[in-house]
Every structure is written in C-alpha cells, then in structure tokens.
Amino acid sequence: MNKILILGGTGMLGNAIVRHFKNNNNYEVHFTYRNEKVAFENFNKENAIRFDCLNDNILNLPKNIDYVINCIGIIKPFMYNDIKNSILINSVFPHNVSNWCKNNNIRMIHISTDCVFSGLHGKYNELSYHDALDDYGKSKSLGEPKNKCMILRTSIIGEEIHKDASLISWTKSQKGKEVNGYLNHFWNGCNSGPKMI
C-alpha cells in the first residue's frame, strides 16, 4: 500500500485530493493542516498532522512516505496580504520540500500554476519559457523545484471548505444578480480535480 502525504490538506485542492485518495483502499493517506477546527469538521484525526510551513520544521514530518503532494500555496487574491510570507510559501517552501523528499527517497508532486505564463503567446507547453508579468506568477515560477519531481501547472476552480473566498462561492452568493463573464476565453483548468494527479 502506497503512503501519501498531502501538504495543505484543508485547502481547496488539498481537501479534494485527500477525499479522493481516502476513498481508495490502495493508499494510506496522511495530510497536514494548520487549523484544527477546519481540519476536523471535515476529516477525522486519523493521519492528520498539524503543520505550518512558515513555523514548523519539515524535518519533523514522517519520512516513511512514498509520495508527497505539495498543495500549499498562497493564491493570487491573497498574495499582497503579506508579500513576504507569500514569497516564502510560494517560492522558498517548495524547494525545502523537494530537498527533504530527495534526502528521504520520496517522490514529489508539486502543484504549480499556469500563471507562470503571461498568456501573451498562447499554446504553452511544459518546456515554454516562464514569462509571468505579475508577482504571483513570478513567485510560483521561482517555487518550481529543480530536483526530480512532477510539476503540475494548472488552474483550478472549486469551493474552499473553510471560507467563502472562491469564485464559485462568490458566484453562488450572487443569486438573482447579473454576473459578468468572458467571451472567447480559453481556459484549461480543473474543478479542483484530484484525478489529474
């Protein structure tokens, strides 16, 4: 049975991945959380690890893991709430995880973003030059580990389990109101879908 550690298991993507793998008997799922109330309203305490990537030492995480999926990150709308911590989380922390995984022979999957690309050139692929123009895209670009790991550059949409900060939550709250959108806009995102992993 493969053991998976999901870093950021109570975020939008992380909780979807925890739920997906918990329903599969081929995996033993562990996940990290920061807020106990959020974590245990939605999951049981089994295999849950309190971990704050800014204050806790990654060396204290369990090492008998086969895969680490890094879902920890500051999303674009919150980037400027604390720019220093956003850069530490998006740009520095993934390299710490990557080195820890390498030293412990753990396979790493790092969730990045398609925002490492500006969108000006279109039809990007995994070898395309990162040309982000904003701080968020640049922070995520800097955070892509160079050690051997799988990097998924995607855009997700879904609901947060602990706050009404997502686009879907906002759209649902607009019941009866006109909501503006886009025409002829290409988007290749996922609905917080763990199946991409």
Enumerate the predicted regions with their spans.
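N-terminal Rossmann NAD(P)H-binding glycine-rich loop of SDR-like oxidoreductase domains
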Residues: 3-24
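NAD(P)H-binding glycine-rich loop region in Rossmannoid oxidoreductase-like domains
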Residues: 45-89
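Conserved Rossmann-fold NAD(P)-dependent oxidoreductase catalytic core, especially the SDR/UDP-sugar
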Residues: 95-131
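NAD(P)-dependent short-chain dehydrogenase/reductase
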Residues: 133-134, 145-197
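N-terminal Rossmann-fold cofactor-binding loop
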Residues: 30-40, 53
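SDR active-site strand-loop-helix element
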Residues: 7, 32, 68-72, 108-114, ...
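Conserved catalytic-core motifs of eukaryotic protein kinase domains, centered on the activation segment
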Residues: 78-84, 119-122, 163
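Glycine-rich NAD(P)-binding loop of the Rossmann-fold in SDR/ketoreductase-type enzymes
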Residues: 81, 85-96, 130, 138-141
